[in-house]
Structures are given as structure tokens and as C-alpha cells.
């Protein structure tokens, strides 16, 4: 795919079937002329970035297509200190996510006694005075060695009611071998709230997951706490020189995967099937495109590609040849199955630049699908997003929140010779995309 770049400020893509050429125009900040401060496109959409910290090359304020703002705070080392989204900026909340870095470790005669850590705070709109906190500890190699998270554990003793307890959930300890590989991994433990920044040295009482490696750092055997074992063997196929990886799970099921020197899978074998070995082989062309798949019964599926690396034909044994045509932009224009070819018909696709707007079927045009998108003056945060979809069953309209989440859908179903039924469903999310509320409105008939 070719594109035009004009003085580094405008990129124009190839034309689609309508002759439309998508373009993006870039405007740079006036001080250093290095960082993009505004992007416009052929749809009329625009996004902006501003308040640059040139020392670190980062923008502290960004505006999306729906003209909603996002802010970032940095510390003196260029690390992100706090992030605010549209919800927080509208309500005056200081952050949705904040970070506190404490990278300095405490050393004793036997090494690190207190590792460095960082605290991540997630603002919780349901509990404004109680952030959800995550503490990550790292060792001298920069490896995360422990993670603590806020949590609630429900316990119940026989004969008593369940009890909720607020705790810190501590990730399981890892034991490393001399080569820095995880040899033992323990289950998580819990601790009382109040010592979140203190490394927890406790090991869970349950046996750990034990991993044994070969000299090439490949896992050879993994033993779970219940003594279930997964074994992996590595060998070379004598005929093709492919790497053969044979995995045996705890139930004795065995599967072999053959990969070539480029890491592509050329053959898989189910070695423990009830009807014998089940083999699937794969063939590629000179530029690593999958062109042939042969199953264990000798059935062959082939694929053909054009010079633009687009698949133009797929021929599975069950359904026959399916062909595709494309425009210069790479949009699929037509699809023709073996049955449609007999009648000289195709499924046709329409686009607005690179955006799908319609699917037209050769038979039963009432099943055609249309897509409508929000323009530059759309409301409900629908600029640049799918606004309405129409198909044979009716239509569905979308309403969005400030973070791009779907807040409401209006589903209209057309029942032939009966009535038009409308269903309205609404959702409410916080800034972490957690569902807080769902409202379902009963059907309304017209």
C-alpha cells in the first residue's frame, strides 16, 4: 500500500473504490517543531495535544475527537505521577490513577532487607476516601518480586455466617535458581491492612509449583501443588529438521508441534487420540503466508494472495472456493462463495473512505446492513463512533460516555405482520470501566 507524505505534515492514503483518499494532517508545536500538537483527517475530526514538557517530550494535556480532555502529571524524573480523565476533570477529582515511586532499597549485610517499591492508587468513585491501592516491589535486577492489592476476603466457619474481611492480597513468593529462572512459585497469602509498603516474607503453606528447565532455559517439567505434572520434550525431526515440541499433560494426553527455523508451525500431531494419531500440516510461501493446510484425512484447504498481501481466494474442501476483491486501500469490495458463483452473484461492501457503511446481499435485500457514524457535530460522544446499525431485524442505536463506553442502546425489532418492539438498555461505569449499574427497560410496542 502506497501513501503520499507531504513535507512531513500530511499523509494521504490510496483511493478507495469511490475515489476517496483518506488523509491525515499534522500540526507541530511552535517551540521545538518536534511534537505533534494537532491531527486532522478527511472526516473533519481532530485531536490535540498541548502543554509539552520538552525535557521528556511528553504532552501533559490531550483532547480527543469528542473534545474531551485528559491530563497527565510528571515528576522531576519524567515519571507519570497522576492521570486525570474527563470524569475527574469535570468533578475536580485530583486523579483517576496516581503513582508514588520509592525505588531506593535498604541493604543489610546479607543483601537487600527492604526492596524498592511503587504504589499505584486507583480512585474509587464509590469510596472517594478509600483508594484501591497496588504496591509492587522489585529486586536489584528490576524484576517484580511481590505485588500487594486491596481486597476483601470472605471466610466462613462451619456453623457461623460468612464474614467479610478487608485485607491486602499478597502475590505468591517466587524462588529463583542460579540463572534467574523461577524454580518455585507459591500461592498468594493475605495480610492485615496497615503494612502495605513492607515486603512480606511469608510463604504459603501449600506446596509450590515447581519448574525444571533444560540448558536452553526451556521448561521441561512443571509440577503443580497437587503433584499433577506437565512434561515437555524437545527433539528434531529427522526428515525436515523441524523442532518437535511434545507436551504430555497430567492426564497423559500428548501433542507434538513441529516448527521450522522461522518459528512457524508446520505440523501438529495429537498423539493420544482414541482413533490414532491426528495430524495437521501447514505450508507457507516464500514470504511466510499460509497457503495450504492438510488435515489428517488428506483434506486440503488452500489460500491465494495478491501482491498486496491480501487473501483473494480460500478453498476449503467442504464449501468450495470463496473469492474476495479489494480496492487500492485494502477494503474488501466483494465476496463470492461457490454457491453464489453458480448464479453469478456477489456480496458487496461499501465504504466511506476506510469505514464500512453497507453490506449488500444479492438475494433478500431486506437483510442488507447499513452503518452510520457520528459526524463532527454529533452529540452523546458519538463523533467518530458507530451511531446506528440497521439490518433485517431492525436497528440499534448507540450512546457513549466520556471514556468511550457504551452507556445506552436502543434496539428496535421489526416483527413482520405484527409490531415494532423497542428495548432500551442503559449502563453506568466508573473511570476504570467497571460496571456499576445496568437498567433494562421493558419492551415498548408500537
Give residue ranges: language-model regions.
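Acidic, low-complexity segments
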Residues: 1-446
Amino acid at each position: 500500500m502506497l501513501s503520499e507524505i507531504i513535507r512531513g505534515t500530511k499523509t494521504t492514503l490510496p483511493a478507495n473504490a469511490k475515489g476517496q483518499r483518506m488523509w491525515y494532517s499534522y500540526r507541530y508545536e511552535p517551540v521545538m517543531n518536534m511534537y505533534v500538537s494537532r491531527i486532522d483527517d478527511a472526516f473533519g475530526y481532530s485531536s490535540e495535544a498541548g502543554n509539552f514538557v520538552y525535557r521528556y517530550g511528553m504532552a501533559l494535556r490531550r483532547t480527543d475527537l469528542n473534545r474531551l480532555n485528559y491530563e497527565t502529571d510528571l515528576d522531576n524524573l519524567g515519571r507519570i505521577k497522576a492521570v486525570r480523565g474527563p470524569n475527574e476533570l469535570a468533578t475536580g477529582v485530583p486523579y483517576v490513577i496516581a503513582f508514588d515511586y520509592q525505588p531506593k532499597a535498604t541493604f543489610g549485610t546479607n543483601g537487600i532487607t527492604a526492596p524498592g517499591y511503587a504504589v499505584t492508587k486507583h480512585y474509587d468513585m464509590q469510596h472517594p476516601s478509600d483508594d484501591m491501592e497496588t504496591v509492587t516491589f522489585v529486586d536489584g535486577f528490576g524484576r517484580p518480586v511481590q505485588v500487594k492489592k486491596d481486597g476483601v476476603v470472605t471466610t466462613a466457619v462451619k456453623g457461623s455466617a460468612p464474614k467479610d474481611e478487608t485485607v491486602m492480597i499478597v502475590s505468591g513468593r517466587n524462588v529463583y535458581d542460579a540463572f534467574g529462572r523461577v524454580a518455585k512459585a507459591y500461592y498468594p497469602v493475605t495480610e492485615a491492612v496497615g503494612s502495605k509498603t513492607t515486603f512480606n516474607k511469608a510463604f504459603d503453606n501449600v506446596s509450590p509449583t515447581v519448574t525444571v528447565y533444560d540448558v536452553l532455559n526451556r521448561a521441561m517439567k512443571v509440577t503443580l501443588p497437587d503433584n499433577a505434572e506437565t512434561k515437555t520434550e524437545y527433539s528434531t525431526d529427522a526428515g525436515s529438521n523441524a523442532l518437535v515440541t511434545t507436551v504430555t499433560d497430567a492426564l497423559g494426553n500428548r501433542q507434538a508441534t513441529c516448527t521450522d527455523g522461522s518459528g512457524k508451525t508446520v505440523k501438529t500431531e495429537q498423539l493420544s487420540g482414541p482413533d490414532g494419531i491426528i495430524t495437521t500440516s501447514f505450508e507457507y510461501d516464500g514470504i511466510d503466508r499460509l497457503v495450504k493446510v492438510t488435515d489428517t484425512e488428506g483434506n486440503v484447504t488452500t489460500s491465494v494472495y495478491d501482491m498486496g498481501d491480501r487473501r483473494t481466494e480460500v478453498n476449503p474442501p467442504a464449501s468450495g472456493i470463496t473469492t474476495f476483491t479489494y480496492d487500492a486501500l485494502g477494503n474488501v469490495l466483494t465476496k463470492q462463495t461457490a454457491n453464489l458463483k453458480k448464479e453469478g452473484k456477489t456480496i458487496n461492501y461499501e465504504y466511506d473512505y476506510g469505514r464500512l457503511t453497507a453490506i449488500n446481499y444479492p438475494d433478500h435485500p431486506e437483510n442488507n446492513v447499513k452503518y452510520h457514524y457520528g459526524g463532527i457535530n454529533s452529540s452523546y460522544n458519538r463523533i467518530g463512533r458507530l451511531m446506528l446499525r440497521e439490518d433485517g431485524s431492525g436497528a440499534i442505536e448507540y450512546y457513549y460516555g466520556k471514556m468511550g463506553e457504551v452507556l445506552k442502546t436502543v434496539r428496535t425489532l421489526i416483527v413482520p405482520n405484527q409490531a415494532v418492539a423497542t428495548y432500551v438498555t442503559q449502563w453506568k461505569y466508573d473511570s476504570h470501566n467497571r460496571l456499576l449499574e445496568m437498567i433494562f427497560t421493558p419492551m415498548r410496542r408500537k
